[in-house]
């Protein structure tokens, strides 16, 4: 695995207000020592959840969600992992939520290869004009005002040279389903 960087992307956990904890099946998959970086789209909402993430990886980046108690989290962040510049926002700033044109504008403002946003509690990953966009969804499947059927999800990015292999983990019923999406920097 030389040259690989594993990045865990997750957010909208809403612990303990909407959910007690991460699904047990996700916790089993998230083993300390395997992941180098964590990018979190916010709404953790407490220090306990942050401390748990710190046990999984030394390098944890969090942006502030609209329900986060810690006001010291920045609104936005740009992180470089390998050859990739990655922008991180919670997503409540994107009007309308999840809007492609608004996301593309932010991507250009941040000048990033990958833009990660959350807030909608709905997983998405797609390429648009040679840039890559990820919304990891809600890792706990926390409810959302606009969405009834929330599927718990998180994303692992395997970054190697100019390629990112994105693995999406979704808890559908009792089974963890994994989907693989590849993005090459042009």
From Swiss-Prot:
The keyword Membrane applies. Pfam families: Metallophos_2 (PF12850). GO terms for cellular component: cytosol; endosome; endosome membrane; retromer complex. One of its GO terms (biological process) is retrograde transport, endosome to Golgi. Transmembrane segments: none annotated. It is found in: Cytoplasm; Membrane; Endosome membrane. Signal peptide: none annotated. GO terms for molecular function: metal ion binding. SUPFAM superfamilies: Metallo-dependent phosphatases. The keyword Cytoplasm applies. Belongs to the VPS29 family. PANTHER family: VACUOLAR SORTING PROTEIN VPS29. Component of the commander complex that is essential for endosomal recycling of transmembrane cargos; the commander complex is composed of the CCC subcomplex and the retriever subcomplex. Component of the retriever complex, which is a heterotrimeric complex related to retromer cargo-selective complex (CSC) and essential for retromer-independent retrieval and recycling of numerous cargos such as integrin alpha-5/beta-1 (ITGA5:ITGB1). Component of the retromer cargo-selective complex (CSC). This is Vacuolar protein sorting-associated protein 29.
């Amino acid at each position: 695995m030389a040259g690989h960087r594993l990045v865990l992307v997750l957010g909208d956990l809403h612990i303990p207000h909407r959910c007690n904890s991460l699904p047990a099946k996700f916790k089993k998959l998230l083993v300390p020592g395997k992941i180098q970086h964590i990018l979190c789209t916010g709404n953790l909402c407490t220090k306990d959840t942050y401390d748990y993430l710190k046990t999984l990886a030394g390098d944890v980046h969090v942006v502030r969600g609209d329900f986060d108690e810690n006001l010291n989290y920045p609104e936005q962040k740009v992180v470089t992992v390998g050859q990739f510049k990655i922008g991180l926002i919670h997503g409540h700033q994107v009007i309308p939520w999840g809007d492609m044109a608004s996301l593309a504008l932010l991507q250009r403002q941040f000048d990033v290869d990958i833009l990660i946003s959350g807030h909608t509690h709905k997983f998405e990953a797609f390429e648009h004009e040679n840039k890559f966009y990820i919304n990891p969804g809600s890792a706990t499947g926390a409810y959302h005002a606009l969405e009834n059927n929330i599927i718990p999800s998180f994303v692992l990015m395997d970054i190697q040279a100019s390629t990112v292999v994105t693995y999406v983990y979704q808890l559908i019923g009792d089974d963890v389903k994994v989907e693989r999406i590849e993005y090459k920097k042009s």
